[in-house]
C-alpha cells in the first residue's frame, strides 16, 4: 500500500511527525478511511463534517507547501496520488 512505502520514505527523515509531508500523508489516510465509511453510512453527518474539516486542513498545508517549496509539493502530490487544487495551480 502507499502508506507503507511512504512511511519508510519518511522514516529516513528523523523529523517525520512534524513535517508538512507527514501531516498531509496522515490527513490523506484519514480522508480515505472516512470516504469509505461514508459510502456505507450516507447519513452520518458528523463524519461528513469531520471530513470537510480534514480536507480544509490538508488544503491549507498543501498551499503552504506549494508556496514554500514547489518541488516537494509536486513530489508529494504524485506520491499520494491526489489532484492539484485549481487555486494552487494558478498561483505559480
Swiss-Prot record:
Its main location: plastid. One of its GO terms (biological process) is translation. The keyword Membrane does not apply. The gene is rps15. InterPro entries: Ribosomal_uS15 (IPR000589), Ribosomal_uS15_bac-type (IPR005290), uS15_NS1_RNA-bd_sf (IPR009068). Part of the 30S ribosomal subunit. One of its GO terms (cellular component) is ribosome. Belongs to the universal ribosomal protein uS15 family. Keywords: Chloroplast, Plastid, Ribonucleoprotein, Ribosomal protein. This is Small ribosomal subunit protein uS15c.
Amino acid at each position: 500500500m502507499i502508506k507503507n512505502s511512504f512511511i519508510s520514505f519518511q522514516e529516513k527523515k528523523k523529523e517525520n511527525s512534524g513535517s508538512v509531508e507527514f501531516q498531509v500523508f496522515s490527513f490523506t489516510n484519514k480522508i480515505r478511511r472516512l470516504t469509505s465509511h461514508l459510502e456505507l453510512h450516507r447519513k452520518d453527518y458528523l463524519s461528513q463534517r469531520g471530513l470537510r474539516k480534514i480536507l480544509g486542513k490538508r488544503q491549507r498545508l498543501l498551499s503552504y507547501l506549494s508556496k514554500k517549496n514547489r518541488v516537494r509539493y509536486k513530489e508529494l502530490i504524485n506520491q499520494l496520488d491526489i489532484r492539484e487544487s485549481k487555486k494552487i495551480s494558478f498561483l505559480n
